[in-house]
Amino acid sequence: MPAAFDAMTTQVIEYRSAERQPEVRRRQLDHIILVQSSWEIEPIQAALSLRSLPRGWDRAGSPPPAGATVERAIDVISSAAKLGFDDITAPHVFPVPGGGVQLEWLQGDRRLEVEVLPDGSTQFVIIKDGDPLKEGEYPLWPPTEAKILFSWLASGA
């Protein structure tokens, strides 16, 4: 891991190597989020910024994602980082009409999209060459199925 990230601190995110800080309890840390890998920083910041979108950001009256929805999206990002696929790219983070958050990982001709809905449910779809191959509920626990999804994604590099 690059030394420049070893003790990087921003307003919202503090990075520490996983060897020194394996457990993260975000709610106890208030506005500091400890991350496992440097690629998490940008998508977590993007997810947090979605809370400040104005109502109607999509011109259809949609609310911004609620705090709980953003926290769930951050949980997905964090759980993906803990799987150990260091060669995958960071996800793009988008608001979804109705108050959801979409995370999109791209790797070659493969794409994994995870959508966090305002009701707390989390859905995924895997896409190859623009064609959806599989969709379903995204599992945060146990990580076995998520690891299969990210293994599929990483093999597209």
How does the language model describe each region?
Residues 111, 117-123, 127-128, 132:
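Long, acidic/polar E/Q/S-rich protein-interaction regions used at subunit-assembly interfaces
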